[in-house]
């Protein structure tokens, strides 16, 4: 206790010297109390739903396994990159795309590209997705369920440099949200009797701040009329008024990527296009919102 008090005196002095005392006293300390409350309460989860989901995943995994073995013409260890490489590049004669120190790569990028040539790589990707959900979320979450049916993770407000919260044991901030199986995992989290689970989120808060700080009239105008900024950006990127859900998702990636300085290469990887197309998208974005570009330079 004595040593802690000595360390504390030095830290408090530094906080004041760095003009951080106000943030510490009025933001970090109140937040720590909220997080302590969250950790103490935890979240209720249905073990029965998890186990039912596990059985459903097992059945689907077995079906995918059979399809893979039929396509490959042989049985092999699906979790062995070396055996998979042998099947893809020697047995099926598919072209190797990337080489590592241990041999030809069978990572997501390679399998996605090879899926254009043969149905087997797509099935491997599907198998991996379901296997991860089963092992990481279904089996992983069960280990943390306490006697009262709740999971109590640990939240940290000082781990990330950006100020975002981190969560571990388990990481409940990383529960999948998209796709049929991701939604089924989320459905395992339940409310106590007499309560409901509700979700609140700031509406495009980062882009609103960008509109305010950059002063870009076009971006501000979208928010002034309560428009859908991702839809408006998509119209600019694709040069048309009728926008699909997939095109809106691309625009969303561009909108948030621009804030953090995404490169043509980074954007091309994120949305699955070539670098020239990504570069043209960034160019069109800045033509629509010119003050965003000027603001980023400042």
Identify the function of each model-found stretch.
Residues 19-20, 50, 215-217, 248-250:
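A short, structure-level motif marking secondary-structure boundaries and short turns
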Residues 250-260:
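Short, amphipathic alpha-helical "recognition" segments used to contact nucleic acids or chromatin
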Residues 1-180, 196, 203-206, 264, ...:
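Conserved "right-hand" nucleotidyltransferase catalytic core of DNA-directed polymerases
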Residues 109, 232, 252-253, 265:
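Positions in alpha-helical segments
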Residues 28-31, 247-252:
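Short, leucine-enriched amphipathic alpha-helices that occur as contiguous helical runs
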Residues 25, 230, 245:
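Substrate-binding beta-hairpin/strand module that engages nucleic acids
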Residues 1, 157-242:
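Function-dense linear segments that define catalytic or interfacial modules
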């Amino acid at each position: 206790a004595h040593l802690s008090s000595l360390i504390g005196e030095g830290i408090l002095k530094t906080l004041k010297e760095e003009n951080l005392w106000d943030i510490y006293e009025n933001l970090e300390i109140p937040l720590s109390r909220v997080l302590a409350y969250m950790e103490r309460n935890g979240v209720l989860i249905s073990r029965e739903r998890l186990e039912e989901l596990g059985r459903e995943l097992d059945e689907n995994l077995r079906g995918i396994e059979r399809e893979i073995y039929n396509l490959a013409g042989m049985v092999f260890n699906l979790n062995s990159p070396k055996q998979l490489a042998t099947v893809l590049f020697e047995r099926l004669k598919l072209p190797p795309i990337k080489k590592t120190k241990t041999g030809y790569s069978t990572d997501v990028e390679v399998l996605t590209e090879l899926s254009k040539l043969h149905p087997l790589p797509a099935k491997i990707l599907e198998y991996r997705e379901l296997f991860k959900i089963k092992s990481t979320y279904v089996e992983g979450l069960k280990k943390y369920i306490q006697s009262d049916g709740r999971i109590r993770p640990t939240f940290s407000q000082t781990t990330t440099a950006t100020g975002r919260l981190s969560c571990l044991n388990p990481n409940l901030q990383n529960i999948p949200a998209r796709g049929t199986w991701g939604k089924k995992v989320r459905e395992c989290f339940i409310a106590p009797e007499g309560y409901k689970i509700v979700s609140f989120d700031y509406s495009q808060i980062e882009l609103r701040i960008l509109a305010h700080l950059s002063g870009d009239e076009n971006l501000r105008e979208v928010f002034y009329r309560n428009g859908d900024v991702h839809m408006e950006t998509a119209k600019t990127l694709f040069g048309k008024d009728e926008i699909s859900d997939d095109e809106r998702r691309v625009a969303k990636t561009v909108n948030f990527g621009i804030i953090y300085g995404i490169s043509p290469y980074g954007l091309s990887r994120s949305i699955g296009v070539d670098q020239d197309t990504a570069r043209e998208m960034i160019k069109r974005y800045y033509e629509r919102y010119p003050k965003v570009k000027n603001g980023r330079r400042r």
